[in-house]
């Protein structure tokens, strides 16, 4: 046989889980000659069933809910005499098929917690006596029939069956998640499993022609593995002009420019380790504003210089990908993060996962529209501040071979007629100035009931973690400008990923400490935060670390680490996703945070935008599995999140990108006379309703003092 015809063909069944592509990666690591296609469990067409015996092995992935929900499809899998591995839900489905009962855990579910597992040292555990297994399950298999199922592994802590094998067929199940970053010896387990399928399926291997990737042409059409938006990269159409000019304080320049009332995007590294601040303005001939209304699936691109526009009946993600493919530039020798390109926000609901939209479908998408689901600017003129070495660069994008005028000199002369380092907006906020009022704050009893509702979903196996949020509505003192309100918030809560953004339909005051995604060259980085501790007294960083490294907070972060690994594995180069350090603790002005860093390599034609779209909304703001969690949260949250829980950042014309998670922030839409402040936390099975409410209050209070005097009991958020 040829090399291609000898490649193992593996079917991976996705049950709409957020860890499926971690299994995808593990399968490729376990067999260099594997070819894996991924299908949704409920999209297995009659044609696929006719081709099913082409596969040398099948893996049934994890998923939410009870396995009985999937029996109409998965029971047919258990009738096949080919190697099959079921993970978590797949394990439960195999056990249920053979007559076991699937019940709720006798004590609490295990979500994001590592268990010690003792094995039989046989079959898939050949050569393995014990493993560490990351457990994400609310249900377990009881009354296992020993005549049809053999027990291969059990947990040491609670004696729960962790692995089984069918006695008559090469069918295996593992209840814990071997694909998790917290599980051990998983590569050996999967190598043992795939050794059963090492000889291609002789029933059909000669019946179908193979394509270059090892699949028959029949099988290729079933694969749901994501691809890049743009498969052929466009040629550069722009050139970059970058000039160093004398240093100006970024806050002072931002204040001068924003006073014109024109759109502005200011990404403010208000705290180390942030090194660069970026100020984008929309006065150039190439400047555009792009906004998206999900309710009508319409994207508008408006030319700033003459206010003309085009409306495109397509989603934001595809439209922006196509736009940026036509607006590319070759990176110069300087090593700056941004030279021009897309800046702005993408709201939480701006994905297919959410059924909601904050845009109003009853109005056409124009300047009268008060809310949009996303709004971005294409910035052709920008300032980049290197805060570490106090250097300022001014950037201009022009069409190829066009010269660049010194537009910044006129701008600075006309707008900055006040001494830049002596502006009132730079003075620290001391809490003695005027305040606004809280218009509405989440009621404790309502929020606590929502926490309990989340936990019922967790007990039922529908989710491992649900990130519940709510919204506070607050007014600002009328005599203060939006930028002055930003300066208040920044003074109280300086953050690495802060920003002030005002576009046609919204204003955002952002004090976020959390990076969502960073993309440099071919390297991608995610930095989720889970676990928040209030700074009190003289608490040291080491003391905070000891308190944050508890079972609940580590469990929350474990779930999101694995979720982000899954998102990256969809597009990253094989074997490139890694987590050098599972847990880190960062110090902020009001709180300590537990976080992790997840890395991966991305190869052309895949872009930062592709990775962003496949990982949006941020997993740290949804829970896991992401789809089921988002849908279950929607009826529990009284208001659409809008900009909160979305992302603010940039995608540069050279391909670089960085986006935050919009938390610790306030925003208002164009027609609003009030501000919205979102806050919440990850509900796990170890949460207490009162504790979750207090965490939500703590996070809201990171931004509320800029608006409200919390020392005045009548105005207190509690």
Swiss-Prot record:
Transmembrane segments: none annotated. Its EC number is 2.6.1.85. GO terms for molecular function: 4-amino-4-deoxychorismate synthase activity. Keywords: Cytoplasm, Folate biosynthesis, Glutamine amidotransferase, Multifunctional enzyme, Nucleus, Transferase. It catalyses: chorismate + L-glutamine = 4-amino-4-deoxychorismate + L-glutamate. GO terms for biological process: 4-aminobenzoate biosynthetic process; folic acid biosynthetic process; tetrahydrofolate biosynthetic process. This is Putative aminodeoxychorismate synthase. It comes from Schizosaccharomyces pombe (strain 972 / ATCC 24843).
């Amino acid at each position: 046989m040829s090399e291609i015809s000898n490649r193992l063909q593996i079917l991976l069944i996705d049950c709409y889980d957020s860890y499926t592509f971690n299994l995808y990666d593990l399968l490729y690591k376990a067999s260099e000659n594997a070819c894996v296609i991924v299908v949704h469990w409920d999209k297995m067409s009659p044609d696929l069933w006719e081709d099913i015996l082409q596969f040398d092995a099948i893996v049934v992935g994890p998923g939410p809910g009870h396995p009985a929900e999937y029996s109409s499809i998965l029971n047919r899998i258990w009738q096949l005499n080919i190697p099959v591995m079921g993970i978590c839900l797949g394990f439960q489905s195999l056990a249920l098929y053979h007559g076991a009962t699937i019940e709720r855990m006798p004590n609490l579910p295990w979500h994001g917690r590592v268990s010690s597992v003792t094995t039989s040292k046989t079959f898939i555990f050949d050569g393995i006596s014990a493993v560490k297994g990351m457990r994400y399950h609310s249900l377990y298999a009881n009354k296992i029939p020993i005549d049809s199922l053999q027990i291969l592994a059990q947990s040491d802590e609670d004696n729960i069956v962790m692995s089984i094998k069918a006695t008559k067929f090469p069918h295996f199940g593992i209840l814990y998640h071997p694909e998790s970053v917290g599980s051990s010896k998983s590569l050996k387990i999967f190598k043992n499993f795939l050794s059963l399928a090492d000889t291609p399926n002789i029933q059909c291997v000669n019946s179908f022609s193979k394509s270059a990737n090892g699949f028959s042409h029949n099988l290729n059409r079933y694969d749901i593995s994501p691809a890049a938006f743009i498969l052929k990269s466009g040629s550069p159409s722009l050139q970059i002009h970058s000039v160093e000019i004398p240093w100006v304080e970024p806050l002072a320049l931002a204040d001068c420019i924003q006073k014109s009332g024109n759109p502005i995007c200011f990404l403010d590294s208000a705290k180390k380790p942030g090194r660069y601040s970026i100020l984008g303005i929309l006065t150039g001939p190439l400047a555009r504003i792009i906004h998206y209304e999900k309710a009508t699936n319409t994207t508008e691109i408006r030319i700033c210089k003459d206010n003309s526009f085009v409306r495109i009946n397509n989603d934001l993600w595809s439209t922006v990908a196509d736009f940026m493919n036509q607006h590319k530039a070759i990176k110069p020798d300087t090593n700056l993060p941004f030279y021009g390109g897309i800046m702005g926000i993408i709201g939480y609901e701006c994905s297919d996962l959410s059924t909601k939209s904050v845009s109003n479908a009853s109005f056409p998408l124009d300047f009268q529209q008060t809310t949009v689901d996303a709004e971005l600017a294409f910035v052709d003129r920008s300032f980049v501040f290197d805060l570490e070495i106090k250097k300022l660069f001014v950037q201009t994008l022009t069409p190829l071979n066009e010269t660049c005028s010194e537009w910044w000199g006129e701008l600075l002369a006309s707008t900055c007629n006040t001494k830049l380092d002596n502006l009132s907006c730079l003075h620290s906020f001391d809490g003695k100035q005027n305040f606004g009022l809280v218009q509405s704050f989440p009621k404790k009893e309502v929020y606590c009931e929502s926490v309990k509702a989340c936990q019922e979903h967790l007990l039922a196996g529908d989710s491992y973690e649900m990130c519940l949020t709510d919204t506070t509505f607050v007014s600002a003192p009328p005599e203060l400008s939006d930028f002055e309100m930003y300066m208040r918030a920044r003074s109280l809560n300086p953050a690495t990923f802060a920003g002030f953004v005002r576009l046609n339909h919204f204003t955002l005051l952002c004090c976020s400490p959390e990076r969502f995604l960073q993309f440099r060259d071919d390297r991608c980085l995610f930095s989720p935060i889970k676990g928040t501790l209030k700074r009190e007294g003289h608490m040291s960083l080491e003391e905070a670390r000891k308190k944050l490294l508890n079972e609940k907070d580590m469990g929350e972060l474990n779930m999101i680490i694995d979720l982000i690994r899954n998102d990256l594995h969809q597009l990253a180069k094989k074997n490139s996703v890694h987590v050098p350090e599972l847990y880190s603790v960062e110090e902020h002005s009001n709180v300590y945070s537990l976080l992790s860093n997840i890395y991966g390599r991305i190869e052309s034609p895949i872009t930062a935008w592709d990775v962003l779209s496949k990982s949006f909304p941020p997993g740290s703001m949804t829970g896991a599995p992401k789809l089921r969690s988002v849908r279950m949260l929607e009826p529990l949250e009284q208001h659409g999140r809008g900009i909160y829980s979305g992302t603010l950042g940039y995608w540069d014309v050279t391909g670089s990108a960085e986006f935050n998670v919009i938390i610790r922030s306030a925003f208002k839409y164009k027609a609003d006379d009030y501000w919205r402040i979102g806050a919440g936390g990850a509900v796990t099975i170890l949460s207490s309703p009162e504790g979750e409410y207090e965490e939500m209050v703590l996070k809201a209070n990171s931004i509320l003092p800029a608006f409200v005097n919390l020392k005045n009991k009548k105005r207190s958020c509690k």
